[in-house]
């Protein structure tokens, strides 16, 4: 493990946020000597961010906890194009009113994680439409475009992936990389930003911005990426059988959010406690050492702490109480129906019918479409959802009062 001097990089390193840094020694020295400003960009493609963006939000939180200034960059300009990075096809283009509404909704998420204001290390939210919408095409090509090599841009993994699959990459999307690099330059001029944070899939875009700032302004700026977030099962973070796990409470209830974290794989508990909670490392080590059924206590603490950050302490307490009443007390007090499954998986529709929770497959599908079906407390909205049967009991619910258990057998 690298021995960093700055509180910021030590914090990121010990909790597992660092994948790559462009010049770790120089960045560490700068962060140890003065307050730095760093940013992450988020495209407002929906009315909320989902759990897949939470690692980046937590990196900004760690930045502020270490005494530095977080800049939340909303892609009101780039969002009109869409980031092609590692996407199989072009994104649907959004109109300006939708983008503005999405940004207003997303800001509510950040207010739970960051302190906004006018202080030296208070967070600021800015929209890149402020400068991108005003760009003049010919001057931009002349002043900025000359610093980019098409040959090099074609070598980026995010572009090669599309081209290797013989999938179209529009000129519109190709320009995204130049605009994102220009964001870094503009933020360094406006706010003195010297660091861009992002996921590992953004490495090429970040390096573009670093080189542009050096060539146009002679500035030394840095990039730092986090690891690709997947679960122990190899699944991309943030998706469940019920769809995306949104961070806004009106799109994913605090209870459903709590259940998402409660259902964490045993092998992910320690890592998620470090990344997604503020618990001290010694407490996390104690929880990670729990074995057998005791690991469930660590999962409940993870769920409580993660929900507290996203929705507040009261919402977390209510979600935990609801889960206990619905899940634990119900299981202990009721003679729940049990279905033994010899195969490695079973469809949710078959499980609902087999447990006698609904009368027919048609009713099961209606139950799922209406949002009344749950797997281990998580809402399941996909009629084709398949449940992987493991050694642990799997609780299936139809509505608030009808529950059953699937067991391997």
Swiss-Prot record:
Pfam families: SYY_C-terminal, tRNA-synt_1b. One of its GO terms (molecular function) is RNA binding. ATP binds at residue 239. It is found in: Cytoplasm. GO terms for cellular component: cytosol. L-tyrosine binds at residues 39, 176, 180. SUPFAM superfamilies: Alpha-L RNA-binding motif (SSF55174), Nucleotidylyl transferase (SSF52374). InterPro entries: aa-tRNA-synth_Ic (IPR002305), Rossmann-like_a/b/a_fold (IPR014729), S4_RNA-bd_sf (IPR036986), SYY-like_C (IPR054608), Tyr-tRNA-ligase (IPR002307), Tyr-tRNA-ligase_bac-type (IPR024088), Tyr-tRNA-ligase_bac_1 (IPR024107). GO terms for biological process: tyrosyl-tRNA aminoacylation. It catalyses: tRNA(Tyr) + L-tyrosine + ATP = L-tyrosyl-tRNA(Tyr) + AMP + diphosphate + H(+). Belongs to the class-I aminoacyl-tRNA synthetase family. TyrS type 1 subfamily. NCBIfam families: tyrS. Catalyzes the attachment of tyrosine to tRNA(Tyr) in a two-step reaction: tyrosine is first activated by ATP to form Tyr-AMP and then transferred to the acceptor end of tRNA(Tyr). Homodimer. This is Tyrosine--tRNA ligase. It comes from Zymomonas mobilis subsp. mobilis (strain ATCC 31821 / ZM4 / CP4). The gene is tyrS.
């Amino acid at each position: 493990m690298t021995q960093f001097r700055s509180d910021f990089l030590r914090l990121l390193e010990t909790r597992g946020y660092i994948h790559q840094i462009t010049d770790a020694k120089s960045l560490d020295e700068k962060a140890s000597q003065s307050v730095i400003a760093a940013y992450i960009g988020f495209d407002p493609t929906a009315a909320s961010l989902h759990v897949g963006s939470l690692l980046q939000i937590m990196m900004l939180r760690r930045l502020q906890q270490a005494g530095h200034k977080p800049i939340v960059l909303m892609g009101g300009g780039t969002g009109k194009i869409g980031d092609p990075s590692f996407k199989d096809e072009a994104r649907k283009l959004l109109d300006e009113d939708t983008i503005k509404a999405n940004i207003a909704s997303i800001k509510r998420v950040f207010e739970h994680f960051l302190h906004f204001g006018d202080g030296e290390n208070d967070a600021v939210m800015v929209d890149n439409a402020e400068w991108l919408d005003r760009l003049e095409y010919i001057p931009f090509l002349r002043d900025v475009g000359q610093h980019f090599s098409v040959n090099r841009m074609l070598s980026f993994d995010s572009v090669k992936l599309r081209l290797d699959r013989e999938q179209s990459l529009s000129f519109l999307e190709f320009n995204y990389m130049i605009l994102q690099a220009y964001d870094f330059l503009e933020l360094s001029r406006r706010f003195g930003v010297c660091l861009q944070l992002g996921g590992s899939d953004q490495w090429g875009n970040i390096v573009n911005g670093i080189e542009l700032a050096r060539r146009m302004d002679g500035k030394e700026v840095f990039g730092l990426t986090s690891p690709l977030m997947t679960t122990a099962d190899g699944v991309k973070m943030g998706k469940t059988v019920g769809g995306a796990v949104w961070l806004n409470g009106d799109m994913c209830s605090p209870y459903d959010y709590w259940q998402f974290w409660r259902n964490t794989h045993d092998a992910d508990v320690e890592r998620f406690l470090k990344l997604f909670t503020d618990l001290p490392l010694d407490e996390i080590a104690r929880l990670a050492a729990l074995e057998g059924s005791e690991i469930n206590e660590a999962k409940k603490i993870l769920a409580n702490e993660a929900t507290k950050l996203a929705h507040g302490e009261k919402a977390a307490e209510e979600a935990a109480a609801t889960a206990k009443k619905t899940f634990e007390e119900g299981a202990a007090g009721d003679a729940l129906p049990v279905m033994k499954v010899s195969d490695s998986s079973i469809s949710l529709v078959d499980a609902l019918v087999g447990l006698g929770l609904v009368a027919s497959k048609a009713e099961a599908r209606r139950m799922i479409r209406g949002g009344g079906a749950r797997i281990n407390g998580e809402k399941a909205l996909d009629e084709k959802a398949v449940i992987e049967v493991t050694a642990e009991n799997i609780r299936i619910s139809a509505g608030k009062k009808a529950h059953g258990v699937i067991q391997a057998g």
